[in-house]
Amino acid sequence: MRFGYWTPVYGGFLRNTGEEGGMEATWDYVKRVSVLADQLGWDITLVPELYLNDRKGIDAPSLEAWSLSTAIAAVTDELRIMTAVRPGFHLPTVIAKTSATIADISSDRFSLNVVSAWWAEEAKQYGGVFASHDERYIQSSEFVRILKGMWRDDRFTLQGRFYDVPAAVLSPKPRVAPRIFAGGESESGREAIAAFADAYVMHGGTPDEVAPKVADVHARRRRLQGGDFEEVGMAAYVIIRDTEKEALAELDRITTVDPGSPGYASFEEFERHSNLDVELTKREYSVGTRGLRPNLVGTAEQVAERIGEFQNAGVDLLLVQSSPLHDELERISAQLFPLLGVESRAVLA
């Protein structure tokens, strides 16, 4: 199992909690976390792309993903960087060029997470294209064809439904094409992703929910691309404490739902515009991306046992949220990594 974490572009992760132990939506904090994670041996960070804050409410600060990703690449040595991109907000030719440059800056540690969007209000405010659910996956497919074509060919041409690229040149090309991650749960989403992505990422679930999903997307990719996905990642919110009682107390603290909180409206819009294959609970609203559904809550030994079930289900990358992140990255590295055979350089005081 490899371990990654979400870069805190919103400051914190919790919708029901205001201040999160010094987590702030600033480059200073992101730099602190990035350097720490790199030193501790974390494998990858997912940098979400949202121009509005869907955790703390749209009036709260949030940082821009692409400028952050370039900066993270410059201050780390080993940490892989997975930057989210929504095709409705970008030209694929420009993203191909930008990605090639960040790949060079990072010595080929850069990858993309293609997100087919869900937030109509954000698209309205920032001028993004917000097509219907199935249309967004068609657009994403064309978008990735252009990325891969420009990274590969001397001149790339495509006349598509969404894009017209007339013999475009990209130089210098990346030494290694950035890996394309993507996630989706609907029938159309899984089919499209199996055709264009290299790796699959999903929101949190139970082992019984995840295992058939992983088997399904691998089978689709074998049919459409001739092989399994190179990685399968899952979002998870992790709470590790010295005793189970302490962990459950923290869980109770962060899941006391306030329907009047600023982030509640964006949660309801996410439900409306995403064809999910499970029903979300208000508890899952508390942290987003169904991060609590895997139930990685307890002592390090209990969480390690649970992670073993996800390994058996086919997950090989956990994308962790936890709060406050700077403390929890070190706690997880020191207490959990050794139980799973993951090299850790953490030393808790």
Show the residue positions of the predicted features:
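An alpha-helical appendage that flanks or caps ligand/catalytic pockets
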Residues: Y5-V9, V35, Q39, Y126, ...
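N-terminal beta1-alpha1-beta2 module of alpha/beta enzyme domains
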Residues: M1-V75, R175-P178, V347
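Conserved, mostly hydrophobic/aromatic
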Residues: F3, A37, G41, I72, ...
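Alpha-helix-loop-beta-strand connector modules within alpha/beta enzyme cores
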Residues: K56-M82, Q139-F143, R223, E330-L348
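Catalytic domains of carbohydrate-active enzymes, especially glycoside hydrolases
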Residues: D28-P48, A192-H203, E309-V315
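Acidic (Asp/Glu)-rich catalytic clusters
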Residues: D38-Q39, T70-E78, S99, A103-F110, ...
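Active-site mouth loops of central-metabolism enzymes
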Residues: F13-D28, A84-T93, V129, P174-E185, ...
